[in-house]
Structures are given as C-alpha cells and as structure tokens.
C-alpha cells in the first residue's frame, strides 16, 4: 500500500515540476527554500520510509500550498474595469453601514463627504479616461471638497461653466468642473448601491450584467412569440415637477436632507443634464450628465412596477372565466409563477394561455410586444401612455398604433431593426434553392446573349463608319448608294466622324420614338442585331427566358405541391431577427466624406493632416465598433462588404491623398503601415481573442457604460503645439503634454430615437468647432473606443 502511495506522490511531483518549468517557476521554487528546510524535508522523507509512516494528504496539501503561492505571486495585473469594480465595492461597504431598518441616512456627511470616497470616485473617472490610478495627481483638493460638503458650503454654481453655440440657435450647454464631476461620481455610486438592487428585471440599464446586448437578446426572443409590437419614445427635459417627483421617490429609501439640498443646487445650476429623449443614452455624449443614468432609472422604476400591474390585469385578471385561484390551471397562479421564474412548473393548461405581455426598457427607450388580440395591445399602450403622462409628467412623441409583428418590415429598437421572420421548412428551403439556381442560370444566359449581340453591334458600327469613309473616296464611292444621295445635306468642312454621329442620331430618333431605354447596349442589341438573328434562334432564347421567369415568380405553395409528401399541416416556426441599419450607415458614410453619392470610396479631406497611424486608428475604430455591435445581426455579411469594399479603400485613398501618390503605389511605399489597415476577419478574430483573454468585468455594460456604445467622432488638426503656445491633454486625470490641438466637428444630430451607425449621432451644436488638446495615446483611445467624449474636460481653456 505504501509503495502505491509513493508512486502516486512521485507522479504528482513530476506533473507539478512539468507545470512549473515552462513558466520559469521551478528555479524560483527551489531558491525560495532555505537549505536547512530542504535538508529537513529529505530527512523527514527518509524517516517516514524507515518507519513506514507516510501522510499522502499532507504531501498533497503542501504541493497545493506551494503552487497557490506562486500563482498569486505571478498573477496578471487587473484590468481597469476590475479596478473600477473593486473601487465601487469599497464604496458599497461604506454605504451599507448607513442602512438602518431598510433606510439609508446621512449618506452625504458620512460617506460622500469623505476624502477617501472622493478619491475613489476620482479614480473611477480616471479609469474611464484610461489613465493609470497609480499616478497621483494633485489637481483635485479632496480634503477641502470634503470639508465644504460636510459644512454645506460647497458652491455648485462656481464649479460649472457654460458653452454657447456659435450658430443661430445659441444653445447653451452647462458642464461641471472636475471637482464637481468627482462629487457627482461619488453620488452616482452611492445611489446605485441604494436603488439598483430594487430595480425591475425589465430594466436593462444601470444593472450589472444588463445592457444593450441583453435588451436586444430579450426582444429577439420574445418578438417571435408576439403578435403586436410598439415602442414608446419619451421626450421631456428635467423641470420642477419632474425633479420634485424624483426627490419624493428618493426619499422613500434615503433620509438625507443635505443630499437633497445638494441635488437641488445642481438642478438650479442646470448641471444635472438629465433629459428624457432628445439623444440616445449610453453613447458617451458630453450632454449626458454623470447622474443621468441613475436618476433616470430611479424615476422610471415607478413605470417598471406599473407595468407589472398592467401585465397582471390583462394576463391574470382578464375576462376569462377560469380565474379561480384554487384551480390547478389558474391564470393568476401561472402569472405569479412566471414572475418568480418557475418556468419548469408550467402545466399544459398554463402553456396554452394565449395572452402574454412583454416589455423591455433601456434607459428612456421602451419596447412592448403582445401575444393576443390588437384591442389588448391598444389598451396596454393607452394605459402605459396614461401613466407616463399623468403620474410621471413625461411627454410621448410617437403616437403610432401597435403594428403586427409579421406584416411590419421591422421595428427600430436601440438603433437597430428588429423583425419577426418565418423559419422555412426543409422543403421550402429546397424549393427556394432550386428557384435561385434557375434564376442565376437564366441571368447568366441573358448576360451572354446581350454581350454577344453588343459585340456584333459594335462591329456593325465599325462597318458603317468604314462605308462612310469609302463614300468620300472617288474611286470607291457609289453614286447610286444612299450615302451619296444624302451627302448633299453635309456641311462643307464637316469631319467624317461628326457626319457619322449626325446620321446615327437621326436614325436613333426615328427608331427609338417609343423606347425609354436609349443606352448604347440596348440600341445595338435590340434594334440592330436581334432583327437580323435567325427567327428560330431568337424564339428559342425568349422561350427559355419566359419559362425561367415563370418558374421563378411562381408561388412556393404551388411548387410544394410538386414535391413528394408535402408537410402543409405543420405550423410555421417564427424567430426574431436583428438587422443592422445598412441604409442609414451608407448615408452617414456619405455625410462623413468616406464615399461618393454613387457609393464609391473616396478620401477624407479632414483626416489628411493627421499622422498615418492616426488615420488608420480612425478607420480601425469604425470597423471595431461595427464588428462588436453587429456581429450577431443577420445581415452581418453586408457590414463585412462595407468594410472590405468601402472603408478599407477609403483609408487607402486618404493615405494616397496625404502623400500625393497613386493608390496603386501606396502599398509599395507603406507596406508595413498598410498591413495594419483593418479587415472584417482580422478585427473579428482580434475581438474574439480579447473576449477569451479579458475578464468578464471588461464586458459588463454596467461598468463600461458610456464606453462600449460610444460612437466615432471626427477631429481635424487645428495646429501644432509650440513652446510659445503650450497645451496639456484635455482628458481628465492626464498630465501629458498634447503635441497638437484638434477641432471637433458635429457632423449630425439625429432625432430621438436614432440609428446606431458607428458615429457620434448627436454631438451638441455648442461643441461644434470646439478645440481640444489630446496626447497621442488618448487620441488613439478616442478613435478606437477606449474612451468617450465624456472623458474630455472642455473647460480646460476657459
């Protein structure tokens, strides 16, 4: 028995050594043990063998302890989202200490107004700005801010600045200073700790593990089981009635008058920047305040709970006679089971209940879908609008009725198109595949026919020109020919080519009086060559084309009857489909100067003055956003085609215009740089590797709010920085010198809700033409989506 234990121990030791040697840990393992310890270990092993006493459990425990110690020593550095999560957990412990009987008190003085809390909040801001928190920056006086907050003398108005638009609108944007932004960040974390555990499950914002991706997944799953769908678009800027209602909701869980006074002072200074509708949320836009997401979710949480009452009234307390709570198939009981997540306990009667109501909310975008009659969907919509208007004092901009999920071309949700499709059966797929083959074969034959006739027609044109030239030679001219008879109408000195074109134009006007198509190919094929083709050949070609067209245009149901064993009794299977807005993306590419009006790639004049690496980073950032956002869409192949055919070519032509060389020569001179120009496959593989290597916190949309969905902005070089006109980086927390100053361009301002195109859809007009200084690292981070415009301190030059 001891011999078997020795064999097991030797095998484990060998596996342990093989694990440590490739990692370079074995030498360190031996070096960390003193010689006396090694000798003692050897003596102990010899004594155990002599006495027959052997502790396998002890040896295994020592091996595990040694391996764990080395794993801890060589652990990977934490990512910035992991650091941000640890900072928020540290603040969470301080907030939990203030909870008494379910209510939180003295949060401002005992939690927020503490230097360590403000420092942690500042570190969270710096992590969002991709700035290392190990570098201590003395620009923020945490002790003095904490003292002012505790004593109630913190002046909010003096810590704000306004930016006025230069256009006719004269729009004013009020933004907080860095000190006030730190205070707002601390308040945000504290309020999320208090309220986020109580948020409804239909809310996919301001919660860990929830976000835009989870909302689209929920909608995609439920639209296949629904009959009617609609969205509600909110529109309301924060006013007195909404703000007072918000404070009353917060007072249900927070007893802190000083915190309410501080929030009221921010509201009066117009620095909360809370607006329902107007622009998409979570896109890292500067006009979205730090407290916007938590305050909006606190306020709209009342609507989320009202939805459960609406759902219960229609699903569980409807006009159905089977509403007895004691019956095994009770709708009320099944409704409570569904809300509790007991999906496996549904009976057959419960599963056959037709009426279902689904709702999903991401910030101020609300989606509804109903499985049932249209009247119920209209009633639910009316009740939801009534509650939003009467109880929450919010306006609704979209007054459209519920649309059928099957008939509609799609519903715009979170910047994408969501629709309900029918999953085709294998027989229908086979029919469609055969029809597609027939259509392509007929198209190939038509192209070959047209190409052949056009080629013959061009030879006919050459023969006609030859005859005209021969008519000018006396020895070859035929006085009885038509050309000789009409030559009297030729002006003196007219060139032969000009005379031939006039003859062709006169002939075409006579032939094409009833034809709308006047292209060269059509004229040569239909009016010159085909009339001379043998009748049998022409009839055979058009007979084949008509038969192919009739086959392709025939209905699938008629074709299924020709197949053996048709399965017409099967129910259609529906599925949800998320579609990327390729038409809207194409319009944005034209607006940003990446393509022409006809869709061809072109150079961008605003990017020419940037460095080569910065130009490539700009295009790479657009490609990365498309791949991350639309990877699961059904038309992702169209996005890949845009990347390969237009984005890459626009990047090459921009670099060619920068160096003033032909685009065919750019690869020879910039071979290494052009190898980094992104393609769809390269970016897709890179993102997959990042998902495998990065921790789950880096993909948590709660932690990456404002970063993961931020759009690409357009910056042009304004000037280079010199010693006489120095400039530091405008990113909060960055102390690096900026080598250049850039001009921000607001290219578009979509109406809410807008399409998600990869670009910043709604930069305020007050920031259009604003100059900012950025270091090279943060310019790259802004382009590839590591930071957003919310990380830029626009008040650095006041």
From Swiss-Prot:
CDD domains: RT_G2_intron. Nuclear-encoded maturase required for splicing of group-II introns in mitochondria. Involved in NAD1 pre-mRNA processing and maturation of introns 1, 3 and 4. Necessary for mitochondrial biogenesis during early developmental stages. Essential for respiratory holocomplex I biogenesis in mitochondria. InterPro entries: Domain_X (IPR024937). It comes from the Eukaryota. Residues 1-16 form a transit peptide. Disruption phenotype: Altered mitochondrial morphology. Impaired seed germination (e.g. many dark and wrinkled seeds in siliques), seedling establishment and development (e.g. abnormal primary root elongation and vegetative growth). Defects in the processing and maturation of various mitochondrial NAD1 introns. Modified respiration phenotypes associated with complex I defects. Seed-specific deficiency in the regulation of carbohydrate metabolism. Small plants requiring sucrose-supplemented medium to survive. It comes from Arabidopsis thaliana. One of its GO terms (biological process) is homing of group II introns. Keywords: Chloroplast, DNA-binding, Endonuclease, Hydrolase, Intron homing, Metal-binding, Mitochondrion, Nuclease, Plastid, Transit peptide, Zinc, Zinc-finger. Residues 578-665 are annotated as: Intron maturase type-2. Belongs to the plant nuclear intron maturase (nMat) family. A zinc finger (THAP-type) spans 729-778. GO terms for molecular function: DNA binding; endonuclease activity; RNA-directed DNA polymerase activity; zinc ion binding. It is an enzyme of class 3 (hydrolase). GO terms for cellular component: chloroplast; mitochondrion. The lineage of its organism: Eukaryota, Viridiplantae, Streptophyta, Embryophyta, Tracheophyta. This is Nuclear intron maturase 4, mitochondrial. Its EC number is 3.1.-.-. Pfam families: Intron_maturas2 (PF01348).
């Amino acid at each position: 028995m001891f011999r078997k234990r020795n064999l097991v121990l030797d095998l484990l030791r060998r596996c342990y050594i093989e694990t440590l040697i490739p990692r370079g840990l074995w030498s360190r393992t031996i070096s960390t043990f003193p010689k006396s310890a090694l000798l003692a270990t050897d003596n102990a092993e010899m004594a155990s063998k002599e006495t027959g006493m052997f502790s396998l459990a002890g040896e295994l425990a020592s091996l595990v302890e040694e391996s764990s110690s080395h794993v801890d020593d060589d652990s990977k550095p934490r990512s910035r989202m992991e650091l941000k999560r640890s900072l928020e957990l540290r603040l969470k412990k301080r907030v939990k200490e203030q909870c008494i009987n379910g209510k939180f008190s003295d949060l401002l003085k005992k939690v927020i107004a503490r230097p360590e809390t403000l420092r942690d909040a500042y570190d969270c801001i710096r992590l969002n700005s991709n700035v290392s928190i190990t570098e201590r920056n003395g620009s923020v006086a945490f002790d003095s801010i904490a003292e002012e907050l505790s004593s109630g003398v913190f002046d909010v108005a003096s810590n704000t600045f306004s930016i006025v638009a230069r256009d006719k609108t004269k729009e004013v944007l009020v933004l907080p200073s860095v000190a006030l932004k730190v205070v707002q960040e601390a308040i945000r974390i504290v309020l999320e700790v208090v309220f986020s555990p109580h948020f409804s499950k239909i809310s996919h914002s301001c919660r860990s593990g929830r976000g835009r991706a989870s909302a689209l997944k929920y909608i995609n799953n439920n639209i296949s089981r629904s009959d009617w769908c609609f969205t509600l678009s909110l529109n309301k800027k924060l006013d007195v009635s909404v703000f007072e209602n918000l404070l009353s909701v917060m007072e249900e869980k927070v007893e802190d008058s000083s915190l309410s006074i501080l929030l009221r002072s921010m509201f009066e200074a117009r620095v909360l920047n809370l607006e329902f509708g107007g622009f998409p949320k979570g896109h890292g836009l500067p006009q979205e305040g730090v407290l916007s997401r938590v305050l909006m979710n606190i306020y709209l949480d009342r609507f989320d709970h009202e939805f459960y009452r609406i759902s219960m009234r229609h699903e569980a307390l409807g006009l159905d006679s089977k509403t007895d709570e004691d019956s095994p198939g009770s709708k009320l009981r099944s409704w409570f089971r569904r809300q509790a997540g007991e999906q496996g306990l549904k009976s057959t009667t419960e599963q056959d209940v037709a009426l279902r109501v689904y709702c999903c909310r991401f910030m101020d975008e609300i989606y509804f879908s109903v499985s049932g009659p249209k009247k119920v969907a209209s009633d639910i919509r009316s009740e939801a609008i009534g509650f939003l208007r009467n109880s929450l004092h919010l306006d609704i901009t979209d007054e459209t009725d519920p649309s059928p999920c099957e008939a509609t071309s799609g519903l715009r949700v979170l910047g994408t198109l969501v629709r309900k499709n029918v999953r085709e059966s294998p027989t229908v797929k086979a029919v469609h595949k055969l029809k597609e083959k027939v259509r392509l074969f007929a198209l190939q034959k038509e192209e070959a026919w047209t190409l052949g006739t056009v080629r013959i027609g061009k030879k006919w044109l050459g023969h006609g020109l030859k005859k005209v030239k021969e008519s000018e030679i006396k020895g070859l001219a035929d006085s009885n020919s038509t050309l000789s008879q009409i030559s009297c109408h030729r002006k003196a000195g007219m060139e032969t080519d000009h005379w031939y074109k006039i003859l062709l134009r006169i002939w075409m006007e006579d032939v094409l009086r009833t034809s709308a198509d006047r292209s060269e190919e059509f004229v040569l094929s239909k009016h010159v060559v085909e009339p001379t083709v043998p009748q049998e050949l022409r009839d055979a070609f058009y007979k084949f084309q008509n038969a192919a067209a009739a086959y392709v245009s025939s209905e699938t149901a008629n074709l299924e009857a020709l197949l053996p064993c048709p399965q017409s009794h099967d129910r259609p299977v529906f599925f949800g489909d998320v579609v990327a807005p390729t038409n809207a993306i194409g319009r944005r590419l034209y607006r940003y100067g990446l393509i022409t009006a006809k869709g061809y790639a072109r150079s961008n004049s605003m990017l020419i003055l940037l460095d080569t690496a910065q130009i490539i980073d700009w295009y790479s950032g657009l490609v990365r956003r498309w791949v991350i956002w639309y990877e699961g869409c059904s038309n992702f192949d169209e996005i890949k085609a845009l990347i390969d055919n237009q984005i890459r070519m626009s990047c090459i032509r921009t670099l060619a215009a920068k160096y003033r060389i032909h685009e065919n020569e750019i690869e020879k001179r910039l071979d290494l740089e052009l190898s980094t120009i992104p393609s769809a496959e390269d970016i897709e593989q890179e993102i997959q590797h990042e998902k495998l290597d990065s921790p789950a916190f880096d993909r948590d949309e709660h932690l990456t709010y404002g970063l993961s969905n931020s759009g690409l902005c357009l910056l042009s070089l304004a000037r280079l920085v010199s010693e006489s006109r120095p400039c530091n980086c405008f990113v909060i927390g960055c102390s690096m010198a900026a080598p250049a100053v850039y001009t921000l361009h607001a290219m578009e301002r979509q109406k809410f809700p807008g399409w998600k195109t990869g670009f910043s859809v709604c930069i305020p007009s007050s920031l259009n033409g604003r100059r900012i200084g950025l270091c090279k690292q943060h310019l790259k981070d802004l382009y590839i989506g590591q930071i957003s415009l919310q990380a830029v301190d626009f008040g650095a030059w006041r």
